[in-house]
A protein has these predicted regions:
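N-terminal Rossmann-like FAD-binding beta1-loop-alpha1 element of flavoenzymes
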Residues: 175-200, 313-321
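A conserved FAD-binding loop/helix module that cradles the flavin
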Residues: 316, 452-483
């Protein structure tokens, strides 16, 4: 009997092999190409997590021989799932919803959805670091949705009708002072003015916008874009006083302001104290970018070296090219993979001619007749910070070399000027660089004084500063006697979306740019808009993770299944698990068609019960095991 079973098993295996050889070619992504794949470990059975499945049909479409059959209702259930893009956005912008509206051709409605959460949709459409895209489930199939570009597209199709639904409460008689007219301060001021408070923003510079105006070059964020948003903020009643430096928070309180928000940006740059750092030709990134933005005469040499591999470093490098530099290098301590700049910024910089030198430490600035001539460097194996926070660098002996330069720009960090809180014992700072606040309320230790933005976090994302401004506005409104409800409903009520077909393979479009030759001769914006057809097609790629079409029927025909696991790998929600003995069990049950009741995951069995550790240890190195722990109810 045993040999008979062995014979049946061998015959069955040969038939599966033959079936695989005869079936048509299939295009898929293997682990070497697809770094973030769903769990395909082999545990005890085939399991399907009903709570995680939204009925997107991805598994059925990925199956090469159509053994999965799904039936879902025509309309979705809304409100029980938060899409990853929505959940990841610091400001809580509902990206899934506005992307869906763009797919439906409702572009102005999409912009209204964005404006429900932020007063800077155009700014974010141009320069947002888009953490939402990093979490986009579509990226598990092919590529994430170009959410930032779609945000810009929506802004470009604004019809202004959202203003008719905007909130504007009657005057409260309360006065608020905002120190710093950057993204955090202006966001807070915008919402506080809508709550009826009299808001005055004090800006030490001659122009409004803070770091988004003087820290981000015009070719990335044209000034007219910022001006449009500032005009909207002024329209709701925010008064902005330029060229006004606040020396003391206490004085503002004595002048009759009921609450103060400290939202000064990180305008103070850092210079590494290297030998020779006092030579002519040394610049600081923040000063350099600010002077260029203010239209001051700024000269750079023919050869420029930027020390620092973050986005600011590449902003300096690309700005130097536009000012006439012939050779621009970015050198940094981090490895190429560990560089702090975004992949987009590095790619665009190199395309424009910036040379990148990662894994470098710096020993001294060389000079000739009082002017810089280069920077002496060492190649670096690795670096780390010890328990005291001191940098430990493992340099390669004998690797000394000089990067020639007429101008050296330090872009190695920046922090806020906090002289206005000096001597105030109630307001605590961290080494005089950032202000300690309550994380939720943004309140400092002094009654009536709040802080937000880079003054609290250090250099951070624009969207993070906007989110901090929202939080501060809520807390300050409550402090001033309001209810803290700054939410608005600006977009029309969305009709219940109907089900669409499962996703087909389609990659994100290339964002258009102006020609390279034109880029280097002007500060004109380099990135262009998506055309309407491309924008709609891109929005249609969205998996609509915030909508749940709970399957009424979900079955797997094991008579045809070839146990390839593509259904599991393709599921963007980790709703399927391949069991350790699933294939063997299917051999014994050739006529078995598994219904959803048969494969529904047993909540009593922990995720670890679905994989076999011995098999997991022997999986190829490129295979990723994602232990599918519950991350919280309602998260897709």
């Amino acid at each position: 009997m045993r040999f008979e079973r062995y014979g049946i098993g061998i015959a069955k295996g040969l038939s599966v092999t033959l079936r695989n050889l005869l079936r048509g070619p299939i295009t898929t992504q293997y682990p070497e190409q697809k770094l973030d794949i769903s769990r395909r470990s082999r545990g005890t059975k085939l399991a399907w997590d009903e709570d995680k499945c939204i009925g997107c049909y991805t598994c059925a479409r990925s199956c090469p021989i159509s053994v999965i059959e799904i039936e879902t209702p025509e309309t979705a259930v809304q409100g029980e799932i938060v899409a990853p893009c929505h959940d990841t956005c610091p400001a809580g912008v509902d990206a899934a919803r506005y992307v869906r509206l763009i797919a439906q051709g409702k572009f102005a409605d999409a912009l209204a959805v964005i404006r429900e959460r932020i007063p800077f949709p155009s700014v974010c459409g141009f320069i947002c670091a888009h953490p939402c895209e990093d979490k986009c489930n579509r990226g598990k199939i092919d590529q994430p949705i170009t959410i930032r570009a779609l945000k810009r597209f929506a802004w470009e199709h604004d019809n202004g009708l959202w203003r008719q639904k905007g909130k504007q409460l009657p005057p409260t008689g309360k006065k608020v002072a905002i120190v710093g007219a950057g993204p955090a301060g202006l966001t807070a001021g915008y919402y506080l003015a809508k709550q009826g408070h009299k808001v005055t923003a004090f800006e030490s510079l001659s122009i409004v916008g803070g770091m988004i105006r003087v820290g981000i070059p015009d070719y990335r964020l044209p000034p007219r874009i910022i001006d449009d948003e500032i005009d909207e903020i002024k329209r709701v009643g925010v008064e902005i006083k330029l060229n006004t430096k606040v020396e003391s928070v206490d004085k503002l309180l004595k002048d009759g302001y009921d609450a103060v928000l400290i939202a000064v940006g990180a305008h103070r740059g850092v210079k590494i104290p290297l030998p020779g750092s006092d030579l002519d030709g040394i610049l600081i990134a923040t000063d350099f970018l600010r002077d260029v933005a203010l239209g001051k005469p700024v000269k750079v040499g023919k050869r420029v070296v930027v020390i620092g591999g973050g986005n600011v470093g590449f902003d300096c490098a690309r700005t130097s090219l536009r000012l006439g530099a012939e050779e621009v290098r970015v050198a940094c301590l981090e490895s190429r993979r560990g560089m702090l700049a975004s992949a987009e910024e590095i790619e665009e910089g190199e395309h424009e001619g910036v040379l990148v030198h990662p894994s470098h430490s710096f020993t001294k600035i060389t000079g000739d007749n009082g002017h810089v001539s280069g920077v002496e460097c060492l190649d670096v194996r690795s670096f780390a910070f010890d328990k005291d926070g001191k940098l430990q660098v493992d340099s390669i002996p004998g690797s000394e070399h000089i990067l020639p330069a007429d101008t050296i720009i330090f872009a190695v960090g920046q922090w806020a000027e906090l002289g206005l809180v000096e001597g105030m014992d109630e307001i605590k700072t961290v080494r005089g660089r950032t202000i300690e606040v309550d994380e939720e309320t943004k309140a400092t230790g002094k009654k009536g004084v709040f802080a937000a933005g880079d003054a609290v976090t250090g250099t951070d994302l624009v969207i993070t500063a906007i989110a901090a401004g929202r939080k501060a506005a809520i807390a300050m409104d409550k402090y001033l006697g309001g209810d803290g409800d700054i939410d608005e409903v600006l977009a029309p009520v969305e009709a219940m979306p109907t089900r669409v077909e499962g996703p087909r393979e389609a990659f994100r479009p290339e964002i258009p740019f102006i020609p390279l030759k034109e880029r280097l001769s002007t500060f004109k914006g380099v990135e262009l808009s998506l055309e309407e057809q491309l924008a709609v097609e891109e929005a249609e790629r969205c998996l609509r993770c915030d909508l749940a079409y709970h399957p009424e029927k979900y079955q797997v025909d094991t008579r045809k299944c070839i146990f390839c696991g593509l259904c599991v790998e393709s599921c963007p929600f980790d709703a399927l698990f391949l069991g350790y003995v699933y294939e063997q069990a299917a051999y014994r049950n050739q006529e078995l068609v598994l219904q959803k009741e048969d494969i529904k995951r047993d909540e009593k069995v922990p995720p670890s019960g679905y994989y076999h550790p011995e098999v997991a240890e022997n999986l190829p190195k490129q295979t990723l095991l994602v232990y599918n722990e519950k991350k919280g109810k309602g998260k897709a």
